Amino acid sequence: MPMPHRNTILIGLALAVLGSGLIPPTWAAAPQVPVKGMVTLVDLGANSCIPCKMMAPILEKLEKVYRGKAAIVFIDVWKTPDEAKRFNLQVIPTQIFYDKKGKEVYRHMGFMAEKDIVAVLDKLGAN
């Protein structure tokens, strides 16, 4: 197979994966955190960290549930170490919640259960 066709196939495959929902859009290209005018949850972790992997399906579900009401953002700090410094990260995963004005209002370190995340998002008015 000639190279140009191979590259076209690879690009098409990548776009199909991104468009399929396997990688939520806010994770594929993370917006500026916090997202202006929205309750924002940023989860700082790594794709290879075990508790982070346990949280991934929870965050994917909540990203769909709260779409348009809250921004759910994942940042892999092993791939982007400057982000760890920016957020004064001590452990992964860490979840940081921002109100609609962009003020950090809550920080949790370690695995966070879905019901606990929902409670914070709802308290901030994302429901």
Predicted regions and their residues:
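Non-catalytic, surface beta->alpha helical segment in thiol-disulfide oxidoreductase systems
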Residues: 99-127
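Structural micro-motif
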Residues: 88-96
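A short beta-strand-turn-helix
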Residues: 26-39, 81
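Bacterial N-terminal signal peptides
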Residues: 12-21
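Short pre-active-site segment immediately N-terminal to redox-active cysteine/selenocysteine motifs
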Residues: 37-40, 44-48, 91
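Conserved redox-active cysteine motifs that mediate thiol-disulfide chemistry
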Residues: 44-58
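Thiol-based oxidoreductase modules, predominantly thioredoxin-like and allied folds used
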Residues: 63, 68-81
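Bacterial N-terminal signal peptides that target proteins for export
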Residues: 2-12
